[in-house]
């Protein structure tokens, strides 16, 4: 369907650009977009509204799927023939700088063959626990930024993300998360949020968007109207937030309004029920019964509230449509039709595409939408509005004029994961470290030439980061010659299961761990709260129970010994260690995926979380601690009966 029409589109673009020479400003842009739109077929409009992924691929000659990291003839032909509006990358796709650069260029060349419309090349580069660039700068994450209390750090984070993505030709990031994390039991947002104060979240998001804009990268505020006050992950279920419009306007919606007023170009919808905003039900072709509409499928929420009342003029994109919040209730065709009628402009991952055979599913969706338009179920004017928003965004960001010659591999290699970006990352991570408890001025540690310090990570990929922090402290002269520092871990993670090196209940220690605990005079241990329900203290959980018992063992063996806990994930576990001498929160547990020491002779070129290293550096006194908790800590029910 693509090639002949793409030549018509090229003609329309040329005529539009000639006409624009006598025009200026918005008029020129509108003329070009209108001309493009008027020459598009109905099916092209539908596919322009699609953001597809090629996360993994199996060619006709392959025995199994593998990560799609290099263009092949099958995907090339698909992108040439379908006028997709966008392609989204995952970590599977963008592992190394040169490889990522080549893949981006190849996708755009396929999309623009016969003068087709260039793509929005997209990824979720949030920073922190959600980052995609395998060789990029991970950053400490949004909650760490919130803990610094300085919006300039959010702007710097936006600049780092923007500089690295733009150098690779990735023009859109589905970030920042502007959800207000006001539910400690939230399993999916947590560290991805700047915190629980809506005003602060708005200011931080605004600064990060400003940083992205300096490198012409499109930002996307998510997940509208808010995913912060949920206890269900919409990847696996359908959450519900039972709040009134007034309550939302006074809290969850505040950061979105700030972003809209600033000119945010894209907002992502959430697969969440908001019954007080919309109690409409529709008949589901999949479940064969009446079902409520989540935000992504709600006209009242996306059109009436977001576009009309709040004044959003940009592109509304869905969260991934293969998530259970949608897919468990609606089939793919019905879900896409409902989303379009709700006011969605860009459909993220309408179906999974991993081989040529999967294209039949996508064709069925396109056919279904085309039939719905022809039957009057969807007005073509709704598609025209959506495509106009997408093309206007591409025009405003210069994407319609994409040229491979505007990009340089040398620049990408010099930018992605650069020493300059890593230095800024380190500084921000250190500023975020929050000392919650510091009995008798335990911190910074007073290390002498006779000291014996034991650093205990949760997992192997964190161990190298603790070692790196200690080496930085030694280089700074804070660990004198003669002092001993040993590094171990208490979890043995395998693909099949997690096995403790030391039992969580403290009943059976391994001899090697016992020897280390008896040997040390100072214990620094990571507590990785991860996705635990914080309504109770999980002393029988490996990630928190084990470090609790490590601290307890050392304190009972010799009260003169020093114990320090690093809360490396959501900070709600900081009150679980009453016996510890000092407790700090670092807001990120990402390790080094190569399990190598970063920056040394065997340094890793992969993006690694800076948070744990920063915590170790603060413990030894390389940096002071200035962070503040950006969330309140609910009181635990102190029980082991979970």
Show which residues each predicted segment covers.
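Gram-positive cell-envelope targeting signals
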Residues: 1-29
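Preference for extracellular/luminal or secreted protein segments
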Residues: 27-80, 116, 299, 308, ...
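Short, well-ordered alpha-helical
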Residues: 32, 36-38, 42-130, 178-192, ...
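Second-shell residues forming the walls of enzyme active-site clefts
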Residues: 38-41, 62-67, 71-74, 96-115, ...
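Structural recognition of the beta-strand scaffold that forms the well-ordered cores
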Residues: 48-53, 85-90, 118-123, 129-131, ...
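Short acidic, glycine-rich surface-loop motifs adjacent to enzyme active sites
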Residues: 53-57, 74-97, 174, 184, ...
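Flexible hinge/switch segments at interdomain interfaces of large molecular machines
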Residues: 132-136, 175-183, 224-230, 359, ...
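A charged helix-plus-loop insertion that forms the helical arch/lid used to bind
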Residues: 138-149, 195
